[in-house]
Amino acid sequence: MANCVVRDWQGKETGKASLDLKVAKETTALDLMHRAVLRQQAHTRQGTASTLTRSEVRGGGRKPYKQKGTGRARQGSIRTPLRPGGGIVFGPKPRSYNLAMNRKERRLALRTALMARIDDVTVVKDFGTSLEAPKTREIVDALGRLGIEADSKVLIVLGTPSEVLRRSVRNLEKVKLIAANQLNVFDLLHANALVLGEEALATIQEVYGDD
């Protein structure tokens, strides 16, 4: 179990919150998270790269010159892979790069990643709920009050981010805002600082705490 300090929008301490999640064994945790990240990145690949083999390249049906008597190397087609404009040997073809991983393993990897970064987590009550209009400066100032620089990699996880909040954050290149149900291993490990809304923390505990 980990205890986190809860702060308000002004950065003042308002209480404490706990997070109790089962994690992987120390001997297998690194491999588990690594496989989860590889799977996540593999699933983002379109897999549409495609090349033409010598049989698919247009032309090349006629033998370019006779077999003997020219002093040159024998050629059967101008579309041989040995010539410019020829086919590609063992080039990529459209395929799926998806990797399989059990649901229990995926959930365990996410819990392990979150608990591994618990020292970098800042829990905030009512993050950005007072914003009436999109204002990037308000987000930068709020992060500053929490001791977090907006030009570092920051992951903000909220229960249900409002449109005003999304528009306020989108101008910050290194700040990413996601909902609690979009939590993933890569973002957890990639960020330098994590900001969790109090309601998001409760959602995470409810969804992942029973395993």
Swiss-Prot record:
Coiled-coil regions, chain positions: none
A biological-process GO annotation: translation
Pfam families: Ribosomal_L4 (PF00573)
Annotated spans, Disordered: 40-87
One term under GO cellular component: ribonucleoprotein complex
Residue spans of biased composition, Basic residues class: 60-71
Sorted UniProt keywords: Ribonucleoprotein, Ribosomal protein, RNA-binding, rRNA-binding
Family matches, as InterPro entries: Ribosomal_uL4 (IPR002136), Ribosomal_uL4-like (IPR013005), Ribosomal_uL4_dom_sf (IPR023574)
Entry's Gene Ontology molecular function annotations: rRNA binding; structural constituent of ribosome
SUPFAM superfamilies: Ribosomal protein L4
Polar residues: bias regions: 41-54
Function, as annotated: One of the primary rRNA binding proteins, this protein initially binds near the 5'-end of the 23S rRNA. It is important during the early stages of 50S assembly. It makes multiple contacts with different domains of the 23S rRNA in the assembled 50S subunit and ribosome.
Subunit annotation: Part of the 50S ribosomal subunit.
Similarity comment: Belongs to the universal ribosomal protein uL4 family.
HAMAP family: Ribosomal_uL4_B
Protein name: Large ribosomal subunit protein uL4
Organism of this sequence: Synechococcus sp. (strain WH7803)
Lineage of producing organism: Bacteria, Bacillati, Cyanobacteriota, Cyanophyceae, Synechococcales
Gene: rplD
